[in-house]
């Protein structure tokens, strides 16, 4: 059975790299607790984020929106909201539960988020963002960070970005920013289009780091390979990978060796799937549905013979009544025998 990883939020010695050196982005409907458990089997070092959770859901919701596995560490909670007191309250709850970081969403452009007065629209209210960050900083000892864009609508000059960062850094005492290297259109584009249509401007984020060298700055947007991540790390403190890490999670098996420690082992995907079995059995015994777990592992064998059969078997069988670990075992047997044998299957 896979043993839980442990990660201290207050290590005895200063870590070689910032916590944000490599992270998997918060992605709504994707980075739930099942996803994070699986990703942690693939990398010990990557910082994992929750889906965005609103302050209202945490304070008034019936579900436990702060639930996570102890194995998730290092793990960050992304909050959506704009009320400093509510954010401070939620940050304190999260710290008590053991989260390693609190992140404020100032980058999501969806209409639903805007109607709640949080997300990317807050870029136009730097003073309010600063108040929110300061309230959380005063409430907790763990890092409080911001994830934002390089601009919104017509407010897309480099000067605007600098003024926003400077205000939040000075008034809010925020030291860590993750910048999605695209502007956001608050109307006219869907959230999906806002991740694809506005052009990427990596150089603008590099310049931001040069102009604010004391800040920890990570980049997000369009990162598809670890080679690209390494290139960004020549200029910045961290890289956040989103859709590629989710749709092709095999990339995470290389993260620890490529970005943290050249002597770190590379996790093999077959053993990671097998290590997931006890978790699946435990979750199913508590009423979870297999499909809610297996949807996160569909892309693990991307590019390997048998990957299509693997995906098809899981997609067609995981939602059937009574589906259990045997469905995953059957799917794994469809992966190329030569690959399976090469990793000791």
Curated annotation (Swiss-Prot):
Pfam families: Dus. Keywords: Flavoprotein, FMN, NADP, Oxidoreductase, RNA-binding, tRNA processing, tRNA-binding. CDD domains: DUS_like_FMN. The record marks 105, 192, 195, 308, 311 as: Interacts with tRNA. Its cofactor is FMN. It is an enzyme of class 1 (oxidoreductase). One of its GO terms (molecular function) is FMN binding. The keyword Zinc does not apply. The active site is at residue 108. FMN binds at residues 26-28, 78, 147, 180, 220-222, 242-243. Catalyzes the synthesis of 5,6-dihydrouridine (D), a modified base found in the D-loop of most tRNAs, via the reduction of the C5-C6 double bond in target uridines. Specifically modifies U20 and U20a in tRNAs. Belongs to the Dus family. DusA subfamily. This is tRNA-dihydrouridine(20/20a) synthase. It comes from Yersinia pestis.
């Amino acid at each position: 059975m896979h043993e839980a990883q442990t990660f201290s939020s207050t290590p005895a010695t200063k870590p070689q790299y910032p916590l944000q050196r490599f992270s998997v982005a918060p992605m709504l409907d994707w980075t739930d607790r099942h996803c994070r458990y699986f990703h942690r089997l693939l990398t010990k070092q990557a910082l994992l984020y929750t889906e965005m959770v609103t302050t209202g859901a945490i304070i008034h919701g019936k579900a436990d929106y702060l639930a996570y596995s102890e194995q998730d560490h290092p793990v960050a909670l992304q909050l959506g909201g704009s009320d400093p007191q509510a954010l401070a309250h939620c940050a304190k709850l999260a710290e008590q539960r053991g989260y390693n970081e609190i992140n404020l969403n100032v980058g999501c452009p969806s209409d639903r988020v805007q109607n709640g007065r949080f997300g990317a629209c807050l870029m136009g209210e730097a003073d309010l963002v600063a108040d929110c960050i300061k309230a959380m900083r005063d409430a907790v000892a763990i890092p409080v960070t911001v994830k934002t864009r390089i601009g919104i609508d017509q407010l897309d000059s480099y000067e605007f970005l600098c003024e926003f960062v400077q205000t939040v850094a000075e008034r809010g005492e925020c030291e860590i920013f993750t910048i999605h290297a695209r502007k956001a259109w608050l109307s006219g584009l869907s959230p999906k289009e806002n991740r694809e249509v506005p052009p990427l401007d990596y150089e603008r984020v590099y310049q931001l780091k040069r102009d604010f060298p004391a800040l920890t700055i990570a980049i997000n947007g369009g990162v598809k390979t670890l080679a690209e991540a390494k290139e960004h790390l020549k200029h910045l403190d961290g890289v956040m990978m989103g859709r590629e890490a989710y749709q092709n999670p095999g990339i995470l098996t290389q993260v620890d060796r490529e970005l943290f420690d050249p002597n770190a082992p590379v996790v093999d995907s077959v053993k990671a799937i097998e290590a997931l079995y006890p978790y699946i059995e435990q979750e199913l015994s508590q009423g979870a549905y297999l499909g809610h777990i297996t949807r996160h592992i569909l892309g693990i064998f991307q590019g390997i013979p048998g990957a299509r059969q693997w995906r098809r078997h899981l997609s067609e069988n995981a939602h059937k009544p009574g589906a259990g670990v045997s469905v995953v075992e059957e799917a794994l047997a469809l992966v190329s025998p030569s690959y399976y044998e090469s990793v000791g299957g």
